[in-house]
């Protein structure tokens, strides 16, 4: 048996907690030297107790305010590893994690970006999910925690988490295992994808190579392909800081 087949058979994580939340309109808030603006977000999640239905585009009771950059088939579930709390505990004002601090739906234990790959297929409860792309943090995470450059910090550390698409709808529950079923692209860890996207902007061949991974989300394929062809791509400051980046 090949080593990668053995790895697939034995790789398991734990869904420590599940969070959902619907979008809310929030009043203006000042953030450092930035002017106050009202904002709408679904980043504030509540813990789910007991089983919850996982649909093709989201968990029951979950929603996103910005449907252009969040949600959809490739971003049905946002996932974040609990292992990163040790790093963020010295930066965020909250002392103990309760789940959902980064707006995630699944808070995991036992799997990080270095352990999982684009296209990995997992069973969770009666559902089947697949990794589509790393998460790209936006300005709403910074606004939530009142730390202006938090999205940039998350991106630079590589502690981004990732997204699942849903291959089979089902019922999921916290404190249940997440079991790896298939690994079609072991070369494309989430860590590697993050590095190519955010730290190796001049590596055009790597961008092109990753862009042709068929299980990578369409938006990442498009961005990387534009880069490899030296075409204009979106300014990341818009995502990281919103309309106040200039």
Task: Tell where the protein language model's regions lie, with residue ranges.
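Electropositive, beta-rich accessory/interaction domains or terminal extensions
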Residues: 2-142, 149, 185-246
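Short, structured beta-strand/loop micro-motifs enriched in basic residues and often containing a Trp
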Residues: 102-111, 154-164
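Loop/turn positions that initiate beta-strands
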Residues: 119, 169, 173-176
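Short beta-strand His + acidic residue motifs that chelate non-heme Fe in jelly-roll/DSBH
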Residues: 131, 164-166
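Hydrophobic, well-ordered secondary-structure segments
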Residues: 160-161, 175, 190
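Short hydrophobic beta/alpha edge segments that flank linear recognition/processing sites
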Residues: 178-181
């Amino acid at each position: 048996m090949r080593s990668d087949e053995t790895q697939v058979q034995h790789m398991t994580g734990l869904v420590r907690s599940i969070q959902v939340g619907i979008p809310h309109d929030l009043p203006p808030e000042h953030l450092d030297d930035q002017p106050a603006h009202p904002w709408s977000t679904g980043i504030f999640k509540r813990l789910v107790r007991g089983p919850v239905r996982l649909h093709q585009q989201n968990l029951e009771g979950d929603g996103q305010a910005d449907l252009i950059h969040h949600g959809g088939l490739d971003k049905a579930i946002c996932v974040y590893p609990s292992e990163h709390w040790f790093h963020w505990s010295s930066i965020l004002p909250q002392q103990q994690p309760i789940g959902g601090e980064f707006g995630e739906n699944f808070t995991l234990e036992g799997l990080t970006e270095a352990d999982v790959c684009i296209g990995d297929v997992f069973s969770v409860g009666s559902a089947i999910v697949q990794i589509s792309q790393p998460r790209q943090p936006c300005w709403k995470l910074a606004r939530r925690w009142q730390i202006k450059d938090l999205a940039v910090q998350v991106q630079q550390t590589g502690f981004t988490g990732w997204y699942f698409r849903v291959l089979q709808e089902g019922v999921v529950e916290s404190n249940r295992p997440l079991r790896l079923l298939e690994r079609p692209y072991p070369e494309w860890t989430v860590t590697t994808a993050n590095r190519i996207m955010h730290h190796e902007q001049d590596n055009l061949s790597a961008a092109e190579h990753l862009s042709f991974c068929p299980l990578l989300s369409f938006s990442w394929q498009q961005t990387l392909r534009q880069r490899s062809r030296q075409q204009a791509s979106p300014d990341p400051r818009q995502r990281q800081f919103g309309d106040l980046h200039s």
